[in-house]
């Protein structure tokens, strides 16, 4: 059954719309970073020297820059296409993109855009900001941080909309 379904004519092609964003980010960060401090002390009850470890929080700061090229955000509302499935489709190979031609859609299903440019850009910026937090933590001298503050700037913002191909195969499992 599965072997028979693997024939290429059982795959159904369709196009999913995406917004692709390219931008450069630069941000300054500041956070309290945990440092382990080991101390020796004299325990008068046992009349011996002992060692204890404590956490000392120190302020650190830094700056990070990163370039994003073709950062994809789905143009399909999450209610229509499961985000978990969608996440497993990404990344696409973007090296062979071609300019849109309506003839490419002849005989192939394509979803229309549900997500407009402003909402897609807001999603991209939110996701990039989450990644920036991880970049800031990685830039710190220890991954245990608190009170993280980020001041981020975007530059060279560009966008385009894409139809990316997906193939679906359905088979019945017995």
Segment roles from a protein language model:
Residues 1-173:
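Charged, low-complexity helical/coil segments in non-catalytic cytosolic or luminal regions
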């Amino acid at each position: 059954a599965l072997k028979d379904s693997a024939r290429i004519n059982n795959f159904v092609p369709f196009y999913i719309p995406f917004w692709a964003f390219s931008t450069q980010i630069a941000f300054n960060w500041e956070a309290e970073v945990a440092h382990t401090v080991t101390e020796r002390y004299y325990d008068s009850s046992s009349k011996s020297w002992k060692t204890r470890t404590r956490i000392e929080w120190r302020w650190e700061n830094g700056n990070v820059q990163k370039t994003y090229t073709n950062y994809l955000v789905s143009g399909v509302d999450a209610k229509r296409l499961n985000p978990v499935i969608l996440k497993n489709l990404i990344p696409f190979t973007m090296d062979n993109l071609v300019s849109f031609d309506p003839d490419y859609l002849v005989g192939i299903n394509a979803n229309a855009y549900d997500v407009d440019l402003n909402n897609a850009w807001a999603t991209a910026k939110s996701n990039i900001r989450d990644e920036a937090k991880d970049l800031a933590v990685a830039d710190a001298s220890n991954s245990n941080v608190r009170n993280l503050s980020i001041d981020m700037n975007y530059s060279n913002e560009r966008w385009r909309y894409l139809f990316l191909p997906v193939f679906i195969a359905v088979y019945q499992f017995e």
